[in-house]
């Protein structure tokens, strides 16, 4: 940095590169400006949450509440991106169930082990995801985020570079799973229902 003479983290370069790639991809993928703006806002918030939770083990409320607001707002704007749910009732139910699912996990783990399994930031993030995709997305996104976390963390547990009591930010895995669900959720449900 020219101002403070400190080294700028390489993470900033990657974040800006990822945003640029997303921006171009979304521009080519979307058919109208409402979709373009909405999806870009969502992905920018996802990236900010991803890196903040990864580094600081916290998801600021302002980011979660911004996502929840966008998840509810999308029901009223003239866009019909088929990968989102467009029923306000389903958005609200999805948000409530997303929040309560994580809250119950936190509550039960606290009762059984007297430890915090996750933070309420993860619960609010699942509420936001529920507002975008509705109730049916919650089990699949939680399943995929748990499997993704396990696959990424398991090698460090086997190598003993991390122990079972180490903090693991769960938000990034929820976000990865939400993006996966955005593209493949309906296809997976079609396979499961066959």
Q: What is each PLM-predicted segment?
A:
Residues 119-121, 155-180:
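Interfacial loop-to-transmembrane junctions
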Residues 1-33, 190-194:
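N-terminal transmembrane signal-anchor/hairpin module of polytopic inner-membrane proteins
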